[in-house]
Amino acid sequence: MPEGHSVHRLARSLHSSFAGEPVRVSSPQGRFAAGAAELDGTVLEGADAWGKHLFLAFDRDRVVHVHLGLYGTFVREPAPAPEARGAVRLRLESPRWYADLRGPTACDVLGLDGRAAILERLGPDPLRRDADPELAFARIRGSRAPMGGLLMDQSVIAGLGNIYRAELLFRHRVSPFTEGRAMRPAVLAAMWDDIVGLMRDGVRRGRIVTVEPEERDALAALDVDRPASDDPELDGGEDTLALRRLRRSTGTYVYRRDGRPCVRCGSTVRAQDFQGRRLYWCPRCQRAPRVRR
């Protein structure tokens, strides 16, 4: 599933390509035919994101809400648009660009009230300037749930996925099994500042890199026999010599590195199924504290 930085990057791309002009809207697949007919030829006023949710604002307060889910893609290409192939749920067209949406979990026309109802369910988004991290801190510190689950809860922090969850916890030496109520405010504040920086970097690069520059050569040496990543969130985007060396690994400390040595302590990185997703951590660097009952 695309993480929040990818959806923000997509929103910026669509905004720069289509905002401020009438667009052709169609649904070659047919599942969005009624919505497309309502919007066809109207002005797309802007595109923005909150967490993993994409919003396309059209005139007369109409909003298309898109959630890509696990398999959705929304790809922009230069015009002219070819004949649609495959299950294209939504196509946007302008004289210069077209964009095809395939396989989303959600694609619906909403009003402003509908958008507000979705945002009510979401926590603060680290990539939004109006984000209030204190809302996330209060939810975390008021919970007995483990941090490995809380960071994936979109009502706590919007936009984090499996990669950022694993890497953020490792970078701050927090066990994924630590209860939220055990977290110190200073650690939560440091984690928030860190994830803001990591996600902004992800928007800029077009890929997730969480390994500090001074540790990249050591990690690449540990993973020299490992195939390049096939995860679109980890590969692609900015291509530099330093990042090409990381193609042998993933540019991450623990994510998808189970069974391999931790670059910081040498212990074997572990993984297990946790709440429906794969969880990665270093048992030595991320020891769980005891919590009084």
Put a short name on every predicted segment.
Residues M1-L112, P185, R270, P289-R293:
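Gly/Gly-Pro- and Ser/Thr-rich, intrinsically disordered tail segments characteristic of DNA damage-repair
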Residues S13, S17, L122-D125, L222-D225:
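Low-complexity, intrinsically disordered/propeptide-like segments
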